Amino acid sequence: MKLSIIVKKIGMLIALVFVMGAIGQSVLAQNLDTQNLVRFSGGIGDISTGSTNTTVRGVAAAGQIWVIRDLAADVSQNGSIRLDGRGLLLGAGDAVGSNGNASVFATLFCANDGNVQHSSNPAGVALDVNGDFRIDDTLSPAPPNPCTSPVLLIRVTGAGSWFAAGIPKN
């Protein structure tokens, strides 16, 4: 009889631990979600036309066509950025399908602060041969909270022109 009571109590304790764990994960997920300032899912490559209509928030487009297969980025309220890009490659010309030996950095613009450039380290990260890259950095200066009408540009080091843009995620 005592053994069955002990087994029941252990079962209840295990169930309680699982419930508390689930609640804890839910709270943690909500806290992480509220720390995000802006998120981006998907990317648009630069299709230069030779006119100024490809200038975005004062930044000129690259001189050649660039394509990007995928982009995902999270910018936190403290300005930290985690960005994964896939397949950022030249989309035309003699070097089509190559990474152009480029290095890139990210810049976030917010309409409510006059489109100040909030950038990752301008020394950038080199594109892998297949155009993949990761930026794990802190934007400087830190963006405002909230950040209205956010625009995220992937830019080439040196010249600073843009190769790709992130698509804001709601």
Features from the language model and the residues they span:
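Bacterial N-terminal signal peptides
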Residues: G11-A22
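N-terminal segment immediately downstream of the Sec signal-peptide cleavage site
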Residues: L28-A72, K169-N170
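Short, surface-exposed binding/anchoring microloops in extracellular/periplasmic proteins
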Residues: V56-G100
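Exposed beta-strand and adjacent loop surfaces of beta-rich binding modules
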Residues: S80, N101-F105, S149
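A mature extracytoplasmic/lumenal domain signature
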Residues: G87-L89, C110-N112, L139
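Extended low-complexity, serine/threonine- and proline-enriched intrinsically disordered segments
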Residues: A95-G114
